[in-house]
C-alpha cells in the first residue's frame, strides 16, 4: 500500500513553517490519539501516520531529503539521517495538555530542584532597628564534592531505559494520561552503576553550612530575607533551593514596637505631675527631654517625632510615644507622711471638687447609684 504524502497527512502546504507544522500535528494527534479512540484500529493507524509525518517534516535534514526524493529518501539506506523513528511524545503532549490546562511543557527533570530551607533569626530591637551582619549556621544538604553532585564514583551515568532520561513516566487512567516520577530511577532520568562512596549515589551530603547575612535596618518580626540558591542542593546536579530567613525581634525592656513607631511608659512623681517639670527619657538614639505641664494626668501621651524606627521600605522615620504614669510614693518618712496628711486636709468641701474634679464626679456617681437602688 502506497504511503500518503506527509504534507497531505498533516493538512499543510509544502511551504508551511515550523510553527504551522507543529499546530497541524497537534490537531491531528489530538483527533486520532488512541486514548480518545479506544479500540479504533483506523484511528490508531492515522495517529501513527501523523506521528511519522511530523517526525520527518520537523527535522530540517529529513524534510529536505523528503522534498527532493519523497518517501524514497528513507528507503535502501538513502540519505536523510535515517528513517522516521518518532518524536518525543512527552514533549509534544506536554505542549498540548500544558496549553489546555494552563501549564507549560517541562523538559527532562526541569521541575526538579533542591528544597527551600527556612531559618528563624532572633534579633534584639537595637539590632533590628540599626541593621546588622550576622553569621548563621544551618544544617542542610550540599553538593557532594568528590562526585560533583553526579552520585557516580567514576562520573559515569546511564540514561534510564524506563523513562528514557525524562525522569517521568506516563500512567494511563482510562482516556486520561498522568505523569509521575519514574520509579526505576527515582525521577533522576539516569542510573548509576558505580555509586559514589561518599554520598552513596545521592549526589548530596549533610553538612552545616555557614553563611553571612546582611540584615537591613528597620526589619520587624515576620519579615523574610530570601537568599537565592542557598537552600538544599538539587538532586543529580539540578539547581539548589533558596534559603528564607524569618526575622523574630525579641521583647525589649523599655520599648514596645508598633510598625515604625515606638511606645514606652515614663513614670513621674505626684509633685512633677501637679507642678510640671522637664524629664529625661531614653530613645534608641540617646536621651531626649519632654516637658511635663502642670496638672498632667496618668495616661497622657507625649510624641517625639522621628524618634521611632526608620522604615525598611519607605525610609521614613516613625515616632516615639511616651505615656506618663503618675507614681504613688512608697516607703515614706514620717515627715513626708505628715506633709501629705496636711495636704490632704486641704481637700474639703468645694475645694475638693475644684482640685479633684474626676474624684468628685466619681463620688457623685456612686452616691446617685445607691440612691436609685434604695429608693
UniProtKB/Swiss-Prot annotation:
GO terms for molecular function: ATP binding; heat shock protein binding; unfolded protein binding; zinc ion binding. Keywords: Chaperone, Cytoplasm, DNA replication, Metal-binding, Repeat, Stress response, Zinc, Zinc-finger. Zn(2+) 1 binds at residues 144, 147, 196, 199. CXXCXGXG motif repeats lie at residues 144-151, 160-167, 182-189, 196-203. One of its GO terms (cellular component) is cytoplasm. It holds the Pfam family DnaJ. It comes from Xanthomonas euvesicatoria pv. vesicatoria (strain 85-10) (Xanthomonas campestris pv. vesicatoria). Residues 5-70 form the J domain. GO terms for biological process: chaperone cofactor-dependent protein refolding; DNA replication; protein refolding; response to heat. Participates actively in the response to hyperosmotic and heat shock by preventing the aggregation of stress-denatured proteins and by disaggregating proteins, also in an autonomous, DnaK-independent fashion. Unfolded proteins bind initially to DnaJ; upon interaction with the DnaJ-bound protein, DnaK hydrolyzes its bound ATP, resulting in the formation of a stable complex. GrpE releases ADP from DnaK; ATP binding to DnaK triggers the release of the substrate protein, thus completing the reaction cycle. Binds 2 Zn(2+) ions per monomer. CDD domains: DnaJ, DnaJ_C, DnaJ_zf. This is Chaperone protein DnaJ. A zinc finger (CR-type) spans 131-208. NCBIfam families: DnaJ_bact (TIGR02349), PRK10767.1 (NF008035). Zn(2+) 2 binds at residues 160, 163, 182, 185. Its cofactor is Zn(2+). It comes from the Bacteria. The J domain is necessary and sufficient to stimulate DnaK ATPase activity. Zinc center 1 plays an important role in the autonomous, DnaK-independent chaperone activity of DnaJ. Zinc center 2 is essential for interaction with DnaK and for DnaJ activity.
Amino acid at each position: 500500500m502506497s504511503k500518503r504524502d506527509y504534507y497531505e497527512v498533516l493538512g499543510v502546504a509544502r511551504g508551511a513553517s515550523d510553527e504551522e507544522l507543529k499546530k497541524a500535528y497537534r490537531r491531528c494527534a489530538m483527533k486520532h490519539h488512541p486514548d480518545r479512540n479506544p479500540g479504533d484500529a483506523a484511528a490508531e493507524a492515522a495517529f501513527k501516520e501523523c506521528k511519522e509525518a511530523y517526525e520527518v517534516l520537523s527535522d530540517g535534514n529529513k524534510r529536505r531529503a523528503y522534498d527532493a526524493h519523497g518517501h524514497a529518501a528513507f528507503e535502501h539506506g538513502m540519505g536523510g539521517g535515517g528513517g522516521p523513528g518518532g518524536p518525543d511524545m512527552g514533549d509534544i503532549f506536554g505542549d498540548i495538555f500544558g496549553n489546555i490546562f494552563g501549564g507549560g511543557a517541562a523538559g527532562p527533570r526541569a521541575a526538579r530542584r533542591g528544597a527551600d530551607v527556612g531559618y528563624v533569626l532572633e534579633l534584639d530591637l537595637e539590632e533590628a532597628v540599626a541593621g546588622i551582619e550576622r553569621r548563621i549556621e544551618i544544617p542542610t544538604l550540599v553538593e557532594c564534592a568528590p562526585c560533583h553532585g553526579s552520585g557516580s564514583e567514576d562520573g559515569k551515568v546511564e540514561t534510564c531505559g524506563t523513562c528514557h532520561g525524562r525522569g517521568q513516566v506516563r500512567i494511563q487512567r482510562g482516556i486520561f494520561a498522568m505523569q509521575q516520577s519514574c520509579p526505576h530511577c527515582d525521577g533522576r532520568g539516569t542510573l548509576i552503576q558505580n555509586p559514589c562512596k561518599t554520598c552513596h549515589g545521592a549526589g548530596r551530603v549533610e553538612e552545616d553550612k555557614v553563611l553571612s547575612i546582611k540584615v537591613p535596618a528597620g526589619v520587624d518580626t515576620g519579615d523574610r530575607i530570601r537568599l537565592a540558591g542557598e537552600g538544599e542542593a538539587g538532586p543529580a546536579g539540578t539547581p539548589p533551593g533558596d534559603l528564607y530567613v524569618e526575622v523574630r525581634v525579641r521583647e525589649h525592656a523599655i520599648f514596645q514596637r508598633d510598625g515604625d513607631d515606638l511606645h514606652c511608659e515614663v513614670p513621674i512623681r505626684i509633685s512633677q505631675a501637679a507642678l510640671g517639670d522637664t524629664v529625661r527619657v531614653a530613645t534608641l538614639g540617646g536621651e531626649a527631654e519632654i516637658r511635663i505641664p502642670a496638672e498632667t494626668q496618668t495616661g497622657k501621651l507625649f510624641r517625639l517625632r522621628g524618634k521611632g524606627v526608620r522604615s525598611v521600605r519607605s525610609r521614613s522615620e516613625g515616632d516615639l510615644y511616651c505615656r506618663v504614669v503618675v507614681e504613688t510614693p512608697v516607703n515614706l518618712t514620717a515627715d513626708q507622711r505628715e506633709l501629705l496628711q496636711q495636704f490632704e486636709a486641704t481637700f474639703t468641701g468645694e475645694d475638693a471638687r475644684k482640685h479633684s474634679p474626676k474624684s468628685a464626679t466619681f463620688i457623685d456617681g456612686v452616691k446617685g447609684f445607691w440612691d436609685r437602688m434604695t429608693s
